[in-house]
Amino acid sequence: MKLIRFLAVLLCTGLLCGCEMSSLPVGNESAEPPEAVSVDMSFAENTSDMFTDRDHETEFDTKDCVHIQLSGDTASSDSSAVDIEGSIITLTQDTSYYVTGKLNNGTIVVNPPDTAKLQIIFDGVEIHSETSAAFYILSGDKVFLTLAEGSENHLSSGKSFVSADDTNIDGTIFSKQDLTINGEGKLTVESPAGHGIVSKDDLVLTGGIYQITAASHGLSANDSIRISGSTLTVIAGKDGIQADNDEDTEKGFVYLESGTYDIKAQGDGISASNYLQIIGGDYKITAGGGAGASASSESMKGLKASGSMALSGGTFYIDSADDGVHSNTSIVVSGGEFTLSTGDDGFHAD
């Protein structure tokens, strides 16, 4: 076990990259200057396009919304923009929806036109789905899920998932499109058989309080995960936060800006198949059971990026069975405070 305390604000910029250690010169022996290392950090230069203005928009007027009242085994609505078949509630139009109530064993399916950018407000929603996602986004250009201020919302799934058509649904919240979750409410997600929140495109969080418990990944996305100003507590059987895309080299990244993150993951705390960028925030991460856990073939790192990593500010408490901070290429640290307890390296870059 290694315990490392590192105050990065003492550095203007710290660059870690893999290298071999050669013998040091002694006496008057001259030494060749080290070879310059070129690192592509262009991804960190402009972050203004990480969030759109609408990602942060949380206002709504219930008078302008389609109302849906969940009630036990079914729901009710007086709008033709909602199809109700037993416990399957389908939202079909490009409009705003206001949802309240409890659904015992069913699913809200979002299936509007492909160009739709619709807002769905949860205000005291509780949904359990025994064999599918509790909230399933099938179509649309982008969906904005707003947690009403002061509301508590609870989504859960059962012990197995059944595929829908050709879709392998494996999360309590499952989106085939871009998904933004915002607002000032609370969302609890329980997934005993899969992931907590899944997006096959971008997953964006710009506010809210999240309590996520999942047998697999807590948050998972193909294209990117972008989070700002949110409070997350994640307990995951695999990675806490994971973006993974092996088809497009520009995707599969994680961007975190401010917020509070408490992650207990049996795999990696935060993992990106591309780059990982963090600007501020408070992070408490336990990966793989912590530094005292037995070694495993599974990756159990605190922060991991297959591409480059840029850390600028923030407070990090990382307890990991493997490396605390790991990149397959390079790590740039330009601020932050780190307390690392690791079973392997504190900082490691290949």
Briefly describe each language-model feature range.
Residues 5-15, 19-350:
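A composition-driven surface/loop motif
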